[in-house]
Amino acid sequence: MITNRTVDFFDTQFQRQVSEGKFALNPFEELALSFLCGRVLDLGCGLGNLSIEAARRGCSVLALDGSMSAIARIRQVASAGGLPVRAEAVDLASYRITEEFDTVVAIGLLMFFPKARALEMLEDIKNHVSPGGSAIVNVLIEGTTYLDMFEPEHYYLFGHGELQERFAGWELLESRYDNFDAPGPSVKAFATVIARRPQRAAPGRA
């Protein structure tokens, strides 16, 4: 499962955001919003700001996270608004996707696992995007020096260009790098990819 340090880090952050009423989309969620369509899987959804907004725009959303407090907040908002969001608390360290989605989102998630699990999850995401659908993936990469939210030896910083390379054969709709200042003299370095899975070839065609 995700380590206690990570769970505590995000639960504290979620509780602060709820108490302060801060539910704005972050820059990566803002970027993702216009690419969401159809059935959406939001892995590591946090407080569900993107899931809720996607549902308001007509998507049907499955929102998954390891934080019970975050899931409770999503259920409350979705129920009050009559929104098509199903929110479930799961152990993301062992979770397997069981159906295809038009859009699969994993913003700020994969780096919280050792390399083998991070790459396994990425392949699971790719394998469960419907043909013609999109994967939206955002990770921390090498060059990140703010590591307070990680358990030592229990995280993975992707290499520069690695995320893009792992979507070889897909159409890259967005590919970008962003650096953000973090507490102290440290930085968070991100890579974001929005990629469209190829359509299946028509029967009888190569």
PLM features per residue range, with description:
Residues 108-112:
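Short catalytic micro-motifs in class I SAM-dependent methyltransferases
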Residues 1-37, 46-99, 113-120, 124, ...:
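Class I (Rossmann-like) S-adenosyl-L-methionine-dependent methyltransferase catalytic domain
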Residues 105:
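A conserved beta-strand element that flanks and buttresses the S-adenosyl-L-methionine
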Residues 43:
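Conserved beta-strand/loop positions that form the S-adenosyl-L-methionine
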